[in-house]
Amino acid sequence: MISLLMIADDFTGALDSGVQFAKAGLKVRVVTDLNYELENAGDDTQVLVFDTESRHMDAKEAYNRVYQIARKGAMYGVKYIFKKTDSGLRGNLGSELQAILDATEEAVMPFFPSFPKMKRITKEGIHYIDGIKVQDSVFGADPFEPVKLSYIPDIIGLQSKADVKTIKLSEKFTGDEKGIVVFDAMTDEDLSARASTLFKMGKLNIMSGCAGLASIIPDVISLKGKINDSFSIETDGMLVVCGSVNAVTKAQIKYAENNGFTKQGLTPREKTNRDFWSTEDGLKSYDKIEAAYRQNNLFIIDSNDPEDSSETKEYMKSERMNLSETEDTRITCGTYKKTLKDWRYQSSCCYRWRYSCWSPK
């Protein structure tokens, strides 16, 4: 039976917070089908996680997606609804928190933005990444959706009509607050203490935060599961498809290259022509990727241009494409299937100069 429903705005977030519950031994199911019916989760599912893929949508559409799922959860009688937010405050923060409030008709939405283990903390309502304000961090330098503010009520207020209150570590939560309440936290102990207080007051039926909150919530609300001490995964290799422009991710890819992985880039045509992968040239590209993978099954496909290169930009210019067109169409490579001897991939590749996903099937 579903005890907690989580709503994340992207697949990475769905996984990095869902796994916090799995670590506690809980049965977690992650779904990407927005029409998925909760009764189909089965009696053994304790935590159901929806990936709405709404981070890069306009605020209204993001609101609608989150509202529909939260409303479904409320009508189904799920005890706890958790809005998973980005630890760097990207995405449609205000509209999605507002959607949870409206769908559940709860009076207050507690928001815990901190992720202390990752050095992401909130102090006096201001969010910090590695000791600097979020607007001055890598999230503020995001080339697509930079976080331009650091005071969280200001960020929420861009998309929400709700009252927003901040509560410092030295201040008390009375239980009479309305709207969205942002809690300071600089350690996991801060998160646990505050969340425990709200739980005892019956004010934690809905909640919001990132993986930092997810990591402490099972203990706070006494969600129990059986931890499997003998879990292993056997694999003959690893295929990574990266489209992130985040500096940390780029460093991780470089580290992997230096430790045995082979990296292959994509041409501008492969990235921006949504019909490419169904063409003869596209099928040949598949074959080349397969052959390279067979040479080294620790393999990275990187959709970013080489450092200091503008080849994709120049290609788009020559083809009379512009960024607004890629925003409208999301330069989707479509959903394509190909059997590669004894292995198959179904890849849903969304090129927005930032994102692509390739998943084994």
Please place each PLM-identified region on the residue numbering:
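Short beta-strand segments
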Residues: 7, 49-51, 83-84, 110-115, ...
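Hydrophobic alpha/beta core scaffold segments
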Residues: 14, 28, 77-83, 202-205, ...
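Cap/lid and interdomain-hinge subdomains that line or gate substrate/regulatory clefts
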Residues: 1-3, 31, 46, 62, ...
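N-terminal basic/disordered segments at the start of proteins
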Residues: 2-44, 112-117
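Short, structured active-site "lid" loops
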Residues: 45-60
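Short amphipathic alpha-helices and their capping/turn segments at secondary-structure boundaries
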Residues: 39, 101-104, 108, 282-298
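Short acidic, glycine/serine/threonine-rich loops at helix termini
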Residues: 17-19, 92-96, 120-127, 193-197, ...
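Conserved, well-structured core segments that form the ligand-binding/active-site neighborhood
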Residues: 129-285
